């Protein structure tokens, strides 16, 4: 899946409360990426960080620059495993299944330990 010739990286999920609408939140995410010197040179290639909006409550959003739920979220254990840690009962609105129901074990995904 994607570009594999790159260093190991961390994936994490956070849950936030915001009064921003989805487009404003996306703009905030992209601005943060730019401020931290994100370069988009290779699709799915190495990066300093990548901020995605996985879910926005129970909304389904299809716009030119934003799809929520994230369209490849359900295929990616490296997304679902950390998301399950914080939102196991959260419903993914397209499948109408909880994150806990969608996540499958994947030995290639390792939890970070200090």
Question: How does the language model describe each region?
Answer:
Residues 1-10, 18-114:
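Flexible, gly/pro- and Lys/Arg-enriched active-site loops
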């Amino acid at each position: 899946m994607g570009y594999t010739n790159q260093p190991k990286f961390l994936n994490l999920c956070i849950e936030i409360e915001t009064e921003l609408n989805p487009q404003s939140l996306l703009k905030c995410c992209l601005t943060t990426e730019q401020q931290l010197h994100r370069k988009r040179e290779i699709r799915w290639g190495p990066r300093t960080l990548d901020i995605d909006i996985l879910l926005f409550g129970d909304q389904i959003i299809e716009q030119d620059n934003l799809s929520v739920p994230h369209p490849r979220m359900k295929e990616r254990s490296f997304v679902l495993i950390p998301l399950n840690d914080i939102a196991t009962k959260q419903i993914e609105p397209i499948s109408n299944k909880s994150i806990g129901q969608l996540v499958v074990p994947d030995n290639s995904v390792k939890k970070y330990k200090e």
